Amino acid sequence: MIKQIGRFFRAFIFIMPLSLTSCESKIDRNRIWIVGTNATYPPFEYVDAQGEVVGFDIDLAKAISEKLGKQLEVREFAFDALILNLKKHRIDAILAGMSITPSRQKEIALLPYYGDEVQELMVVSKRSLETPVLPLTQYSSVAVQTGTFQEHYLLSQPGICVRSFDSTLEVIMEVRYGKSPVAVLEPSVGRVVLKDFPNLVATRLELPPECWVLGCGLGVAKDRPEEIQTIQQAITDLKSEGVIQSLTKKWQLSEVAYE
């Protein structure tokens, strides 16, 4: 079962952005698999009440590292810094609930591991929302997390006043305290948020076909073809063994329920 996301939010308020490694040092990359994440995105990854980074992606990283025969090391970055650090080989992979988009595929290899096509986003507010949702240009501002697909989509739409924040917590607080009338979230994340903040309501924002994304992908540097092949095989094996399905149930990544 998912730990209470409210505990995640409370923990996040009192814990400084977490770095799971000390200063850079020589590391045996044949023995240690370094995964970059951004622990502000429940249920994929977040900081629990004990200050530990947990979530669907973290459990998956552990399972993949076992397949690779390596020790797992998780490093924390701002979401929009993950791709750069991967391309510079400071990390071996990205597991951060990262949507597979054409623009990201131009920069890194993204290996699908969860979800099908995402054809909609979730609009969240503390006030009643019309269905279908009003054009976002009619709201004074729209809150969204920095570096995410949904931010990229909103910024591509003319006339929307976008307010970007580093974490899901900040996005929700922006709406909860009325600074922005609505926020836009990825549906599986929004589903968890709604459980912990029942005073919020949500509706669908359908995406045009050219903006659909292909689920979540594990990022690997394009110039590491052998790693891509090895990790892809590990993901395939974990799917066939039912491990990923089991983790999906554990972290309640299922159909989003809208009000």
UniProtKB/Swiss-Prot annotation:
Its main location: secreted. GO terms for cellular component: cell surface; extracellular region. Was identified as a potential vaccine component. In vitro, induces antibodies capable of neutralizing the infectivity of C.pneumoniae. Residues 1-25 form the signal peptide. Contains two domains, D1 and D2, which are both exposed on the surface and bind to epithelial cells. Belongs to the bacterial solute-binding protein 3 family. This protein, although well conserved among chlamydial species, shows species-specific immunogenicity. This is Probable ABC transporter arginine-binding protein ArtJ.
